[in-house]
A protein has these predicted regions:
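Electrostatic interaction modules used in gene-expression and signaling proteins
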Residues: 3-202
Length: 202
């Protein structure tokens, strides 16, 4: 965690698990003038979000930079990731809020994704998982709509066990033969049974 000299002990409460301190706007702007990395981060964040940050949003962005131990480059990757995720799901024009960016920042920080190389490795792993998820969607004939949270949870669980689309297509076939439909709990029992026997997984 980096110290900035903008606040001293007792000035603001220490941040909790999902809580950033409160800064004075003039102190943030002064830091922006002196810190080229944060100034560039602020400019790019406003460009991505399409508007000048409010005082509250400015406080959030600076809090992420000041307290979570992330480099400016890492935060830029995080912001672009949040924007790309919404764009893929809803199309152009849907942009993340600073609150959503803050939540994602805490998620990364709690997993010690603090440097650009760590962020790039994490994002590459996410891309591979999304690619696998898409293959499984097609194998289970789940096209034309988004997965529900429960469906996503099942598939992520199976992928984490080492089962890809090819193996899950077999489980899907057996599920439909046994139940006449895609019964998630039934298919889950099949996959877990395989896992216990170390069958079909990678």
């Amino acid at each position: 965690v980096s110290g900035t000299g903008l606040h001293t002990a007792g000035d603001v409460p220490l941040p909790g698990p999902d809580e950033l301190p409160v800064y004075r706007t003039e102190d943030i702007l002064r830091r922006s003038a002196d810190d080229g990395a944060f100034r560039a981060l602020l400019g790019e964040c406003q460009r991505v979000l399409g508007h000048t940050l409010s005082s509250a949003d400015l406080n959030t962005l600076f809090g992420i930079y000041d307290r979570l131990g992330m480099t400016a480059e890492t935060i830029l990757l995080l912001i672009h990731h949040c924007a790309d995720k919404l764009r893929r799901r809803y199309g152009e024009g849907r942009l993340p809020t600073m609150r959503a960016i803050e939540k994602e920042a805490f998620y990364w920080a709690n997993r010690e994704i603090l440097t650009a190389p760590q962020a790039e490795e994490y994002l590459a792993a996410l891309a591979r998982r999304d690619e696998e998820m898409e293959k499984v969607r097609h194998a289970l004939s789940l096209t034309g709509r988004d997965l529900t949270p429960t469906e996503r949870k099942y598939i992520e669980s199976w992928l984490s066990m080492g089962y890809g689309a090819e193996a899950l297509a077999i489980a899907y076939d057996r599920t439909v033969v046994g139940t006449g439909k895609l019964a998630w709990a039934y298919m889950d029992k099949i996959v877990k049974s395989w896992y216990e026997k170390r069958k079909y997984n990678k």
